[in-house]
Amino acid sequence: IILLFIICGFSPLIWAVDGCNQERLSPEEFRAKQKAFIIEKAGLTKEEAAKFFPVYFELQDKKKALNDKAWGLIRKGKDDKTTEAQYAEIMEGVYDARIASDQLERTYYEKYKKILSNKKIYMVQKAEMRFHKELLKKAKK
């Protein structure tokens, strides 16, 4: 879950690799590739995709905001003068952001159920994880 939390937060910044050429994707390009991948792998119809992706990307935006907040806290800890009490505050904030992200996932699952079957939701989740895994593999090459 933590890895997925980090990947989702930085996903628009990941480099995509086509052959030997590395190309930085804009957030819009990243979303377009992600959407196409998920539609194909999860077998979404045009109607399902049209209803699903606005809700899906709304969740991604909210999770990114939480992730940005967590990373902001982590950066505060780089100062050598950070006290133990400040580290405690940082870690509380990071864990609170992770919990909030998980709660958002649960809330949006309920929204997804109004659009897709549970099987399709499962297929979307599987496709999303595969998409990020493939991006990371390509980025390592």
Language-model features: locations:
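Bacterial N-terminal signal peptides that target proteins for export
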Residues: 1-3
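Short N-terminal segments immediately surrounding and downstream of signal-peptide cleavage
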Residues: 18-36
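Amphipathic alpha-helical segments
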Residues: 34-115
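Amphipathic, charged alpha-helical segments and their helix-to-coil junctions
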Residues: 20-24, 102-141
